[in-house]
A protein has these predicted regions:
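Membrane-proximal transmembrane or re-entrant/amphipathic helices at the cytosolic face
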Residues: 163-217
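Small-residue-rich segments of transmembrane alpha-helices in multi-pass membrane proteins
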Residues: 92-101, 149-161, 209-210
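Residue-level signature of transmembrane alpha-helical entry/exit and packing/kink sites
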Residues: 19, 54-58, 116, 143, ...
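Short runs within selected transmembrane alpha-helices of multi-pass transporters and secretion channels
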Residues: 57-84, 88-108, 113-135, 177-182
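Short helix-capping/hinge motifs at transmembrane helix termini and TM-loop junctions
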Residues: 38-43, 47-52, 84, 107-111, ...
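Specific pore-lining/lateral-gate transmembrane helices of multi-pass inner-membrane transport
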Residues: 1-94
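Interhelical loop/hinge segments that connect adjacent transmembrane helices in multipass membrane
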Residues: 6-12, 135-151, 199-204
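Hydrophobic alpha-helical transmembrane segments in multi-pass integral membrane proteins
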Residues: 33, 101-105, 156-171
Length: 217
């Protein structure tokens, strides 16, 4: 995005940011949702059946917190770098840290580990909102609403398919559900042409076919 801003100013930056944000959403949102969906069989494989119940319940919250943190760090906070607003960046990074401390003090004494998980996810959510709001003062970045909605729909259908699959347990369930989820998500995203993905795939295939036809006779 820095190169786009230097080459073509804010119009070029907007196009580059839109493309980057769309790609990020289409790639990371299903990864986070998929991780949450296979939390129990993943825990069975990683820590064994005895500890899988507790560990499986932790995975969805880790996935949510990780996704919010990634979107904030690798997209939303870039507004301050592009706008050369270092002090605002520092202030914005302090928001989730402060929120986490406050929520930990409030929730952990009452809810224990669950409270820690809730406070972590909530603090990253607060940080994302703060970065989005303050970032518009530094360098407004577009929100890829179309890709976000299409990815959300694809994730919902993926979740429905995975949740409808019987629980085989262990590595078999993990492989089956992960494969099914990836297949459903990929088909829906291609069908909706989210982020222009289907158009790009079609263009690449047509280009390869044209090259093959022009090959040695």
């Amino acid at each position: 995005m820095v190169a786009a801003l230097e080459r073509g100013g804010h119009p070029a930056l907007k196009d580059a940011a839109q493309e980057q944000a769309s790609f990020m959403v289409l790639l990371t949102l299903p990864a986070a949702v998929g991780l949450a969906l296979v939390g129990r069989p993943l825990a069975q494989v990683m820590v064994g059946a005895e500890l899988s119940a507790g560990a499986g319940a932790v995975v969805p919250w880790i996935a949510l917190a990780g996704w919010l943190s990634g979107v904030t760090t690798y997209y939303l906070l870039q507004a301050f770098t592009l706008g050369k607003r270092t002090m605002m960046l520092i202030a914005c990074m302090a928001i989730p840290a402060s929120a986490n401390v406050a929520l930990n003090l409030l929730l952990i004494p009452r809810f224990g580990l669950d409270g820690a998980l809730w406070s972590t996810a909530a603090s990253y959510g607060i940080g994302a909102i703060g970065a989005a709001i303050l970032g518009r003062r530094a360098c407004p970045l577009p929100v890829p609403w179309s890709s976000l909605l299409k990815a959300g729909l694809a994730c919902a259908l993926m979740a429905a398919a995975v949740l409808a699959t019987p629980a085989f347990g262990g590595v078999v369930e993990l492989i089956v559900k992960a494969s099914l989820g990836a297949l459903v998500y990929g088909l829906v995203v291609l069908g909706l042409d989210a982020g222009g993905l289907r158009s790009r795939v079609t263009e690449i295939v047509q280009r390869r076919l044209a090259i093959a036809k022009e090959g040695p006779a």
